[in-house]
Amino acid sequence: MNFYKIKILILISFIVFSATLESQIVDIETSRKEDLVGTKISLNLGFDGSSGTVDRTNYSIGTRFDFNNEVWNRFLIFNYSRREKDERINEDNTFLHLRFARKISSIIAAEFFIQTNEKPLEKIEERNHIVKGRRHSPIKNLRLGVGLFDENEKRINLDERNTVRANTYLNYLFNISNNTSINT
């Protein structure tokens, strides 16, 4: 069996294995900028609309702040989006994530984050997480993590719910070629 076929077989195995696992409660792996040292700030604004048979208005705002040094990785992400069709709102989402990760060694990091989001059209008035965790990177592109979540959820027309839960995750960045990869 040649090397190309082995890569395809491994890729299919990761996809099947990932589909059978329960997904992370908070998936932020693709948002990490671990190799960045220094400060980076980005701001995204979006607006589009159309008028005619159907009137549509969509707008969004997103910002990200990264403050990293050799020991600490810190970032803040904020997103808001709203979509309307014929004066009816069909999306109105707010998301805020603040994370601190401290490198303990070359393969271990301790993490803390707070996250809040609101999705009133999905009956989520407010969902807040406070999380402490530990992350291991035993080999390049592999991340293993465990976290303890304190979750508070307020749903529209339902009682408020507090939950403490543990979360584990496995994340692997599978490189197919120099400019193509899949994050599982």
Spans of model-derived segments:
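Short glycine/proline- and aromatic-enriched beta-strand/turn motifs that initiate or cap beta-hairpins
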Residues: 25-73
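Transmembrane beta-strands of outer-membrane beta-barrel pores
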Residues: 47-51, 67-69, 80-84, 114-120, ...
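Cleavable N-terminal export/targeting peptides
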Residues: 1-36
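Membrane-embedded beta-strand positions of outer-membrane beta-barrel proteins
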Residues: 43-45, 76-78, 112, 132, ...
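Outer-membrane beta-barrel transmembrane domain signature
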Residues: 143-184
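Residues that define the transmembrane beta-barrel architecture of outer-membrane proteins
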Residues: 37-39, 55-59, 90-94, 126-130, ...
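Repeated loop/turn-to-beta-strand initiation elements of outer-membrane beta-barrel proteins
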Residues: 39, 70-76, 107-110, 140-144, ...
